[in-house]
């Protein structure tokens, strides 16, 4: 059975275009995979704490020397990673905020990037350990940035996902959403065409 993991990272709980379009893509993937299991990870509703000394300390303390608090922190990270590893297809709703990703998504990445667990260092360089996944990134943007130097979001996402082993990444852009009604309609129509083709 196919498992689809949808990760919503918008800072708004209602009306975020990246979430709405990610919902549409997940529904389309369900139609293409009858019986698929869908898991939704809402990074706003289930917020993760930003990295701090206690979190980093837990990650870098050997298992046999962790405190109860550190074990709880690592268990949370392990659960997020297990959820990711169990998915066959991953849909990420990723709005562009100030040329990058939301702090919610960055924090999620910080909680799943663990040496020896989701990547490892070898004599030939780092190797990602989350392999065999198809990833769709649905990004919503107020302006038009794709293919320009101002799009630091796309290369960052491709780099991070590739670093942990997810190299089959498809980007769906909804750009120009704040450039007026006509531009918004065109952006959403273009994104929906890409969703239909995914």
Curated annotation (Swiss-Prot):
EC category name = oxidoreductase
Listed Pfam families: Flavodoxin_2
**Which N-terminal stretch is annotated as signal sequence?**
none
Q: Which Gene3D superfamilies match?
A: 3.40.50.360
Q: Which UniProt key words apply to this protein?
A: Flavoprotein, FMN, NAD, Oxidoreductase
Q: Which GO terms describe its molecular function?
A: electron transfer activity; FMN binding; oxidoreductase activity, acting on NAD(P)H as acceptor; oxidoreductase activity, acting on NAD(P)H, quinone or similar compound as acceptor
Among InterPro entries, the record links this protein to:
Flavodoxin_fold, Flavoprotein-like_sf, FMN-dep_NADH:Q_OxRdtase_AzoR1, NADH:quinone_OxRdtase_FMN_depd
Top-rank taxon of the source lineage equals Bacteria
Query: What is the free-text note on the cofactor?
Result: Binds 1 FMN per subunit.
Its EC number(s): 1.6.5.-, 1.7.1.17
Per its UniProt record, the required cofactor names are: FMN
Q: Which reaction does it catalyse?
A: 2 a quinone + NADH + H(+) = 2 a 1,4-benzosemiquinone + NAD(+); N,N-dimethyl-1,4-phenylenediamine + anthranilate + 2 NAD(+) = 2-(4-dimethylaminophenyl)diazenylbenzoate + 2 NADH + 2 H(+)
Q: Which residues are involved in binding FMN?
A: 96-99
> What does this chain do?
Quinone reductase that provides resistance to thiol-specific stress caused by electrophilic quinones. Also exhibits azoreductase activity. Catalyzes the reductive cleavage of the azo bond in aromatic azo compounds to the corresponding amines.
On subunit structure and binding partners, the annotation says: Homodimer.
Q: What protein family does this chain belong to?
A: Belongs to the azoreductase type 1 family.
| Name of the protein in its database record | FMN-dependent NADH:quinone oxidoreductase 6
Where does this protein come from, organism-wise?
Burkholderia lata (strain ATCC 17760 / DSM 23089 / LMG 22485 / NCIMB 9086 / R18194 / 383)
